[in-house]
Design a protein with these regions (language model features):
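Flexible, glycine-rich loop/tail regions that form catalytic "lids" or insertion modules at the edges
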Residues: 98-108, 115-144, 148, 222, ...
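Cofactor-binding active-site loop characterized by glycine-rich and histidine/acidic residues
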Residues: 263-429, 433, 636-688
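Active-site pocket-lining segments that scaffold enzyme catalytic pockets across diverse folds
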Residues: 223, 227-287, 604-623
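Active-site cores of enzymes that catalyze phosphoryl transfer or operate on phosphate-rich substrates
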Residues: 202-224, 295-345, 349-356, 654, ...
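Subset of Sec-pathway N-terminal targeting signals
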Residues: 26-69, 73
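Conserved phosphate-handling catalytic cores of large alpha/beta enzymes
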Residues: 407-418, 426-462, 467-471
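Extended, charge-enriched "interface" segments that sit outside catalytic cores
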Residues: 32, 69-246, 262
């Protein structure tokens, strides 16, 4: 039980709760909405009488409350009243239960809302008074300040005057560090934070050497920005000026990592201050950074199109001041704010697996946010939601907010509806430390505390560095257009190093001459680096680069067939139910059917083919990760990768039961998110390439919820940054009359982004093809994302099956010729995916079919030579048709038509739905009519059935 504060009437004690205000200016207006939750004094008195007689019979929190009251009561000159006699009655004097409750209320109030009176905003000279923390509102009068009180759970339960208690509470909770933590439900976490900030009044305490290190680092950050500002006038660099203590925060975390057991950091951040972080945290050579500013700069051995300098990733091994090494990775990122967050979490999780870090203590993810993006971008909340989820947790992330209190030109009042930009972190009960960016020692203290919290509890924590932006959004921008008063104030702000130097001079930690010498030494170093750039023409591109150069894509066959005896091991595990396991009767029938099909070697469907691919890879030592909404069971109830006991819900994973030395199989039902989860799995695939990583959409239609991740990472990352991934995306796609939201994975959008062999895009028509495509991902010598237009109705289509021999021999086919072509066909129909079966079924009812049907299984990269070879026997057909279910402005038509024409010298005729704004009709009747017409048109026939 924790109290706010109490108000006494003649008969009732009120426990008062007040809603938190949106902004500091609204404290008084919000306070008018105060409501009281009435407590009858009899209940307190009754509990007190019980405590006097049998204290152990009460809840421990009541015991603490009454012990505190009793000690305080005695400490004010009263005689002890506690007795175990039935006639015991406490004498109620000046020091009453009510006053003790008010004291507890005051302590709680400062812990809860003390941050609203904090001095952590460097741009504010005066903090609006919060009336809820005034003496009278806390239930005291000036004459009470001299009374001695027992502090209960504050400061370990000591006796202090009310004045001393309030002074220390103000110093702790209303200073340059404001702490929000009472939203944490776990008592041990709240008490841990209290134990770290209350005994020292939340004030930094560093040794002489530590202070000098912090001073040197802040000077280093400032001199770097000053140098760029004067040497590269007007060039975009997204300066950190005004927020240089970001370097303090990151360096402090880095320095403490070895003490906390952290061996590796994976970090993500946007462009603001990125060059400074690269130079002064990551250790990237200033010489190389300066070289990138050259107008004629082209990296040696450049890969692809490249990207601007403040988007590039980097990795390094850094040595702390204590001589211990920490590996640091900075992820490449686009300008799309916060998009990299999920990627960082996935990379961190992958690196934890690589290190065998099951406790998730040795690899630390750090995310650097901007204040406007933190509150504005929905993916921030999605990534916070990873925090405690089995398939996505990373043992806690340290979030650092560069809160320069402006978003390009947007004020906080226009950027968010909450008091703080960090309020979103409360959804996972992350503690939040607001700190004054002009106080590097406080920033360093908070950074160390945040790291310790993460390591102790394995959960997220937020550092909100309140600072300012000295220039505009970029160096060519004039912020005075929209924030003239703010920037008049900013122009008068002293540099942080000046403030710290002044403080350290007063405390005898440095002299002005020593501080100036640090500045001079750093300037000389930067000048020397620039001189090298001007005189030395070449520099290694791969100094810390995260780019990966790989062999080009080629169409050489890949060995993907598997020996029958290996597949038998997989099938045995898939179709064996453990003794005593109460398996759902429907699943039991499914596995019995699977067993029969495998034994016969015929009728192997899509789900079984997938599991044979997974299992065979695992037997070869390749682990598999499958992640997505409902992926354990499968959206269409086809996979059942995990079984649950019908009586006690015991979990059983058949694919984990094959052999002792097999690869791992990790299948996770994801949170209901596309962007964050796809980003996570993409990041995972980057840093753990040994694993087959798969992300599955519930329906392909929903994949555009992750369009930023697709465009900025999956399709273009190799070209921009040399980032190599072989992530598989399963996107259920097909027109089956389910309406515009459950028909299309927007194939055309993926094909539009295809160039330079960046991805592989397939629309497969047989289970065996799917089997070989999955295995090919891990058996080829290059890595490319695989985008699969996955089936829905084909999962149970009687014709969409394969024979076992197709798995034990052969391999992937980019094109599949007609298995039963008519004699002398006059029409050649090219198609892909599900529509092939509609065409085949329709052709069966035609007496004298004249159309041959060839399937395109892989759209990109397009194997032109193989295409010509497969179509060779049909060169004399009079009519060449491309048939698709999608409207003309969608699907593969606009991508394939020019390729077909270039290969064959003939432009195909389009057969499909007319161009529409929406992918599909919502009417089942209209859908059937459209489907019937396009099938008939493709075959050059009228199909005699009402259902087509």
């Amino acid at each position: 039980m924790e109290f706010r504060w109490f108000v006494q009437t003649n008969t009732t004690l009120f426990l008062v709760f007040t809603p938190k205000p949106r902004y500091e200016e609204s404290f008084e207006s919000m306070d008018n909405s105060t409501f009281a939750n009435r407590w009858n004094l009899d209940e307190i008195e009754s509990n007190y009488q019980t405590w006097l007689k049998e204290p152990a019979s009460l809840d421990s929190r009541w015991q603490i409350f009454f012990e505190g009251f009793q000690l305080g009561y005695e400490g004010n000159g009263h005689q002890p009243t506690r007795t175990h006699s039935d006639s015991a009655e406490p004498e109620v004097g000046d020091y009453s239960i009510e006053k003790h409750a008010r004291l507890y209320g005051a302590i709680y109030a400062y812990r809860d809302i003390g941050h609203t009176q904090g001095t952590f905003d460097p741009l504010k000279d005066e903090i609006p008074e919060n009336p809820r923390l005034s003496l009278d509102r806390l239930g005291f009068e000036p004459k009470d300040l001299g009374e001695v009180h027992f502090t209960g759970n504050y400061l370990g339960g000591v006796r202090m005057t009310m004045k001393d208690i309030l002074d220390r509470l103000k110093k702790t909770y209303c200073g340059n560090v404001g702490v929000e933590y009472l939203h944490l439900q776990a008592t041990d976490k709240r008490r841990w934070i209290q134990s770290k900030i209350e005994p020292n009044d939340n004030q930094p305490s560093f040794s002489h050497d530590e202070k000098l290190r912090i001073l040197r680092k802040i000077i280093q950050a400032e001199e770097f920005e000053n140098f760029l500002h004067t040497r590269y006038v007007g060039q975009k660099r997204f300066s950190l000026e005004g927020g240089e203590t970001l370097i303090t925060a990151l360096d402090s975390i880095f320095q403490k990592c070895p003490d906390e057991g952290v061996e590796e950091i994976v970090m993500g951040m946007a462009h603001r201050g990125r060059l400074n972080v690269l130079a002064n945290v990551m250790g990237k050579s200033p010489e190389f950074i300066f070289r990138e500013f050259s107008e004629n700069f082209v990296p040696d051995g450049a890969h692809g199109s490249g990207d601007v300098k403040y988007h590039l990733g980097y990795e390094s091994v850094r040595t702390t001041s204590s001589g211990q090494q920490v590996v640091i990775h900075l992820s490449s990122n686009p300008s799309h704010l916060e998009a990299v967050n999920g990627v960082v979490e996935g990379k961190a999780r992958a690196r934890q697996r690589l290190r065998g870090d099951s406790d998730r203590k040795r690899v630390l993810p750090i995310l650097v946010h901007g204040d406007a993006a933190m509150a504005g971008q929905g993916v921030v909340a999605e990534v916070f939601n990873f925090s405690k989820l089995p398939g996505y947790r990373t043992g806690g992330t340290v979030h650092v907010v560069v809160n320069n209190q402006i978003g390009f030109t947007t004020d906080p009042t226009d950027a968010r509806s909450s008091l703080y930009c960090t309020d979103v972190a409360k959804i996972v009960e992350a503690p939040i430390f607001h700190v004054n960016g002009n106080d590097p020692l406080a920033v360093a203290m908070v950074a160390e505390l945040a790291l310790a919290y993460r390591q102790k509890f394995g959960e997220d924590v937020v550092i909100d560095v309140n600072c300012y932006r000295k220039h505009g959004h970029n160096e060519a921008d004039d912020p005075a257009f929209t924030q003239p008063i703010l920037y008049q104030r900013i122009k008068k702000m002293p540099q942080v190093s000046e403030l710290l130097t002044e403080k350290m001079i007063k405390e005898g930690d440095v002299t002005l001459e020593e501080s100036e010498e640090i500045h001079k030494r750093l300037r000389r170093h930067l000048d020397a680096s620039l001189e090298k750039v001007r005189t030395v023409k070449k520099s290694s591109t791969f100094e810390g680069s995260v780019a990966v150069h790989q062999i080009p894509y080629d169409f050489a066959p890949v060995q993907t067939a598997v020996k029958k005896k290996e597949l038998e091991k997989v099938a045995q595990a898939l179709t064996t139910c453990p003794r005593g396991f109460n398996l759902n009767s429907k699943i039991k029938r499914q596995i019995e059917t699977k067993a029969k099909k495998f034994k016969s070697g015929r009728g192997i469907d899509w789900a079984l083919a997938e599991q044979l691919a997974f299992g065979s890879l695992m037997l070869e030592g390749t682990p598999v990760r499958l992640s997505g909404q409902d992926s354990e069971r499968g959206t269409f109830s086809h996979r059942h990768a995990v079984w649950y006991d019908s009586e006690d819900r015991t979990r059983y994973v058949p694919l984990l039961q094959m052999e002792d030395r097999q690869g791992k199989f990790c299948v996770y039902n994801s949170l209901l998110s596309e962007a964050a989860v796809l980003a996570f799995d993409y990041g995972y695939s980057l840093d753990y390439p040994r694993m087959l990583a798969i992300w599955e959409a519930q329906f392909g239609d929903f994949v555009n919820g992750a369009q930023v991740i697709i465009d900025q990472f999956i399709m273009s990352a190799e070209d921009k940054w040399g980032s190599v991934s072989d992530l598989v995306m399963l996107l259920p796609h097909g027109f089956e009359g389910q309406g515009p939201e459950h028909s299309s994975a927007r194939l055309e959008r993926f094909l539009q982004g295809c160039a330079e062999d960046n991805v592989v895009v397939v629309n497969l028509s047989t289970p065996a093809q799917y089997f070989h495509a999955l295995r090919r991902q891990k058996r080829k010598e290059y890595a490319k994302p695989l985008i699969v237009m996955a089936p829905k109705s084909l999962l149970r289509h009687k014709l969409c099956v394969s024979e076992l021999k197709e798995f034990t021999s052969g391999g992937f086919q980019e094109f599949i010729t007609d298995p039963t072509p008519p004699k002398s066909p006059s029409t050649l129909v090219l198609c892909s995916g599900k529509v092939y079966y509609d065409l085949m079924e329709a052709r069966e009812v035609i007496r004298s079919p004249k159309a041959a049907i060839v399937r395109v299984e892989q759209f990109y990269p397009f194997h032109e030579e193989k295409f010509k070879e497969v179509l060779g026997p049909f060169a004399k057909t009079k009519r060449l048709v491309w048939c698709q279910e999608e409207p003309k402005n969608m699907g593969a038509w606009n991508f394939l038509a020019p390729l077909i024409e270039e290969s064959l010298g003939r432009r195909p005729e389009f057969v499909g739905r007319s161009a529409t704004a929406s992918p599909a009709t919502g009417s089942l009747t209209l859908h059937k009519r459209e489907q019937s017409e396009l099938i008939a048109s493709a075959l050059g026939q009228t199909i005699p059935t009402s259902n087509k």
